[in-house]
């Protein structure tokens, strides 16, 4: 539900949404977008290059995109993962050891992983820092999750530029 345009040479995504003061007032899913932007704007700036690396790595591995057909990593998910782990390398090392039901709760909304797993059943659970009732990784399929872990393991064993280039 967004418009992609090129404005003065920049690729821009325009996301229409309702102006709401909290996520409790949302009328549709994209109403979260301003909350996500505000949450990340200052925190993610020093990690920008790491975010771009992860997004390109996911594109290269065919696991980027949260649409139904791809079932992969969204851009926001990539940003939160880099923020949580503090960089691309740190995230890749952690991801290479992920198991089904991995829980990441950046804001510490829940007392323990068990209580989170009682609410969510997806392979990767990343609690949205702006909406504790939402798993940012809900669109990630078990297949894409497994593929990503394998890619991360391979990359950690032998890093290379080939991981960042999508198959033609």
Spans of model-derived segments:
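Conserved nucleotidyltransferase catalytic core and NTase-mimicking acidic/glycine-rich helix/loop elements
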Residues: 46-168
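Intrinsically disordered, low-complexity terminal tails enriched in acidic/polar residues
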Residues: 28-42
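General "foldedness" signal
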Residues: 19, 26-28, 68, 96
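Conserved catalytic core of two-metal-ion nucleotidyltransferases
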Residues: 1-25
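Histidine (H) residue identity feature
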Residues: 19, 36-39, 68, 84
């Amino acid at each position: 539900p967004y418009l992609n345009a090129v404005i003065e040479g920049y690729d821009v995504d325009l996301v229409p949404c309702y102006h709401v003061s909290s996520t409790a007032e949302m009328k549709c899913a994209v109403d979260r977008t301003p909350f996500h932007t505000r949450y990340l704007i200052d925190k993610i700036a020093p990690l920008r290059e790491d975010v771009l690396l992860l997004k390109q790595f996911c594109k290269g591995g065919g696991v980027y995109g949260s649409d139904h057909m791809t079932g992969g990593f969204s851009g926001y998910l990539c940003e939160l993962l880099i923020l949580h782990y503090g960089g691309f390398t740190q995230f890749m090392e952690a991801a290479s050891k992920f198991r089904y039901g991995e829980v990441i709760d950046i804001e510490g909304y829940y007392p323990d992983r068990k209580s989170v797993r009682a609410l969510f059943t997806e392979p990767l659970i990343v609690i949205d820092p702006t909406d504790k009732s939402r798993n940012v990784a809900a669109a990630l399929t078990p297949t894409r999750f497994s593929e990503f872990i394998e890619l991360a393991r391979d990359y950690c064993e032998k890093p290379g530029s080939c991981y960042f280039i999508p198959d033609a």
